[in-house]
C-alpha cells in the first residue's frame, strides 16, 4: 500500500513506475474514488485536480484511498508546521482531531486530541483506534439492553394474550397461545449502529492493532443484527442518564459511518474516503466554540439560521431564504451575524480590500438589513502575514449606521474561546 500525506492546496507528484512509487495508474484510481465521493463533485475536482504529472489537493481534509494507495490530506493551520515533516503532521493532525471533536460532540479534550495526533497513523486510523478503545472501555460496564415488545405463539401464556390473533390465525390451533410480551434484549438500534461501524471499519482499516481490536469487537457483537447503514434507526436511539456514557460513542460512530465506501463482493474496500470540506468544518467548529465562549452570558448561538427571506412575492410567499453561518442572539434580538471563511485574508498594505470577496460583502449587507443587526463580521483563520489576530478591518455600511468587521482567529493555540469572547466584546458593545 502506497501512502502519501499532503496539505490542502499542495501538489502530489506522480512518479515514474518503480517500487514505492505513486504512479499514474494509482493517481487515476484515486481520481475515480474522488469522483464517486459525495464531496467530490462530478469528476472528483473538489478533492483533486489533475495536472498530468501531479495532483493538487483541494480544500478538503481527511483520508481517501483506492486499491493500492491512500492519501491523507491535512489542513494548513498557521503556526503548527507543514505536512512535509513528522512534527508538523503530528501538530496539525492533533488540531484537526480537536476540531472534529468539537464539531461532532466527541467529548475529547485538547490534551487527548494532541496525544492522538502524535500517533504515526492517518487521521482515519487514529479515529478507528479511538472508537475501538472507547467501545471496549464502555463494554466493561455491560452492553446496553432494552425491553422490546415481541410476538410469539407459545404453548403457555407469556405476557398478555393477543385476542384478535388467537381467534383468527390460531382459531384451529388451540394448543398454541398468541402471546405479546416484552423481552430484555441487546439487539437494539444503538448496538446495531456499533455493529455496522465495526463491520465497515474492518473493511478499510490497515493498522494491525486496529484490525485485531475490530475482530475482537465483532465477536462481542456477533448476536446483534447487521443492519445496512442506510437503514440504521438513529431516531430510535434513546439516551438518558442511565446510558449517557454511550452518547460520545454514538456520535463517533456516526462520524465514521458518514464516509463514502465502495466495497466488493470479497468484503474489502477498493475505494473509500472520509473527507471534510474545510469551509464547513471551520464554520461548525467556530459555532461550537462560540457557544462555549458565550455560556452563562445570556447570549445564544444559532448556526445556519433560516428564519429570514430576501423577497416576498405579490401573493405574500417568501422567496430566497438566507442562511448565515452564525447568528448571536440576546433573547430574540440578533446582536451579531458572523460568516466564516476558510481562506487567507490579505494585509491591508498589500490589498486595501484585504482579499475580501465582493459577493461576501453583498451577502453581509443583506444579513445586516434583514436581521436589523448593527454589526456583521467576516471571520477568517489567522496567518503570519498579518500583524496579530483579532479585528483586521472595520467598514461603515453606506446608507445606514451598521458596520462590517473583518477579523481573524489563531487556531494554533489553546485560547480560541478567549479569543472569540474578546473579539465579540471588542467588535460589538451589545455583548457587554
Which role fits each region the language model picked out?
Residues 1-35, 269-432:
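Catalytic core segments in nucleotide and nucleic-acid processing enzymes
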Residues 1-266, 271-272:
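Residue(s) in the substrate-gating loop at a strand-loop-helix junction
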Amino acid at each position: 500500500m502506497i501512502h502519501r500525506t499532503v496539505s490542502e492546496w499542495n501538489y502530489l507528484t506522480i512518479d515514474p513506475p518503480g517500487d514505492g512509487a505513486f504512479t499514474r495508474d494509482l493517481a487515476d484510481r484515486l481520481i475515480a474514488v474522488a469522483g464517486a465521493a459525495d464531496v467530490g463533485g462530478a469528476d472528483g475536482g473538489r478533492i483533486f485536480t489533475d495536472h498530468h504529472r501531479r495532483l493538487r489537493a483541494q480544500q478538503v481534509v481527511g483520508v481517501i484511498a483506492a486499491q493500492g494507495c491512500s492519501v491523507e490530506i491535512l489542513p494548513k493551520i498557521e503556526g503548527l508546521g507543514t505536512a512535509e515533516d513528522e512534527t508538523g503532521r503530528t501538530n496539525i493532525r492533533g488540531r484537526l482531531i480537536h476540531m472534529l471533536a468539537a464539531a461532532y460532540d466527541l467529548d475529547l479534550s485538547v490534551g487527548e486530541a494532541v496525544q492522538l495526533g502524535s500517533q504515526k497513523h492517518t487521521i482515519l486510523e487514529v479515529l478507528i483506534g479511538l472508537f475501538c478503545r472507547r467501545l471496549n472501555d464502555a463494554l466493561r460496564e455491560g452492553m446496553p439492553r432494552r425491553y422490546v415488545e415481541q410476538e410469539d405463539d407459545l404453548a403457555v401464556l407469556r405476557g398478555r394474550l393477543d385476542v384478535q390473533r388467537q381467534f383468527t390465525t390460531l382459531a384451529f390451533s388451540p394448543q398454541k397461545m398468541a402471546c405479546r410480551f416484552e423481552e430484555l434484549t441487546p439487539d437494539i438500534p444503538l448496538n446495531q449502529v456499533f455493529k455496522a461501524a465495526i463491520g465497515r471499519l474492518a473493511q478499510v482499516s490497515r493498522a494491525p492493532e486496529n484490525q485485531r481490536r475490530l475482530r475482537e469487537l465483532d465477536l462481542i457483537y456477533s448476536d446483534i443484527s447487521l443492519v445496512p447503514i442506510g437503514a440504521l434507526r438513529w431516531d430510535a436511539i434513546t439516551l438518558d442518564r442511565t446510558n449517557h456514557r454511550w452518547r460520545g460513542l454514538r456520535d463517533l460512530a456516526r462520524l465514521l459511518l458518514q464516509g463514502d465506501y465502495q466495497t466488493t463482493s470479497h468484503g474489502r474496500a477498493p475505494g473509500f474516503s472520509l473527507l471534510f470540506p474545510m469551509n464547513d468544518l471551520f464554520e461548525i467548529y467556530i459555532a461550537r466554540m462560540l457557544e462555549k465562549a458565550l455560556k452563562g452570558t445570556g447570549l445564544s448561538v444559532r448556526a445556519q439560521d433560516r428564519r429570514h427571506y430576501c423577497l416576498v412575492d405579490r401573493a405574500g410567499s417568501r422567496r430566497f431564504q438566507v442562511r448565515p453561518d452564525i447568528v448571536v442572539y440576546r433573547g430574540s434580538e440578533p446582536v451579531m451575524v458572523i460568516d466564516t471563511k476558510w481562506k487567507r485574508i490579505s494585509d491591508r498594505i498589500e490589498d486595501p480590500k484585504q482579499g475580501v470577496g465582493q459577493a461576501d460583502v453583498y451577502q453581509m449587507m443583506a444579513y445586516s438589513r434583514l436581521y436589523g443587526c448593527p454589526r456583521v463580521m467576516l471571520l477568517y483563520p489567522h496567518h503570519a502575514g498579518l500583524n496579530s489576530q483579532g479585528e483586521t478591518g472595520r467598514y461603515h455600511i453606506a446608507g445606514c449606521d451598521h458596520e462590517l468587521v473583518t477579523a481573524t482567529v489563531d487556531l494554533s493555540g489553546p485560547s480560541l474561546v478567549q479569543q472569540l469572547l474578546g473579539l465579540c466584546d471588542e467588535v460589538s458593545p451589545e455583548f457587554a
